[in-house]
């Protein structure tokens, strides 16, 4: 991460009635999504997180939802990698065993992987992946 260079969470376009349901990691995810959309990346978010009703959880599992799949999967191939798998974390959260399994498996299949607790690092690393030279990268020591 570049010293002295900080990104704020990007503005969200959500209705006020949904604001109470948006936590810190949700803000991180929405900011990352906003950035990736502005970048024009081919990507998606796997909706694995969050609390769900038991019936909905059973339905999703039956439909093939897998625990531990990284938060963000970027399908654009760059720098010899098949794609970029990114796990977003907040606070003192650490990767689960399932998340570590997926990241290691994707890495063995030629994917670049990242676990990050910072929007700054996320943006910096994604820009690096795409070969984008920015002010933040020129400040890296």
Question: Which positions does each model-derived feature cover?
Answer:
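Catalytic phosphate/metal-binding cores of nucleic-acid and nucleotide-processing enzymes, i.e., regions
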Residues: 1-141
């Amino acid at each position: 991460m570049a010293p002295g260079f900080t990104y704020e969470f990007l503005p969200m376009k959500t209705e006020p009635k949904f604001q109470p349901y948006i936590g810190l990691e949700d803000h991180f995810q929405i900011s990352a999504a906003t950035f990736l959309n502005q970048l024009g990346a081919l990507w998606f978010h796997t909706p694995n997180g969050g609390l769900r009703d038991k019936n909905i959880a059973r339905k999703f599992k039956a439909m093939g939802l897998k625990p531990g799949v990284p938060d963000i999967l970027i399908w654009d191939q760059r720098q010899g990698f098949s794609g970029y798998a990114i796990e977003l974390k907040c606070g003192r959260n650490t990767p689960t065993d399932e998340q570590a399994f997926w990241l290691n498996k994707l890495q063995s299949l030629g994917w670049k992987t990242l676990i990050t607790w910072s929007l700054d690092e996320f943006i910096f690393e994604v820009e690096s992946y795409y070969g984008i030279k920015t002010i933040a990268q020129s400040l890296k020591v």
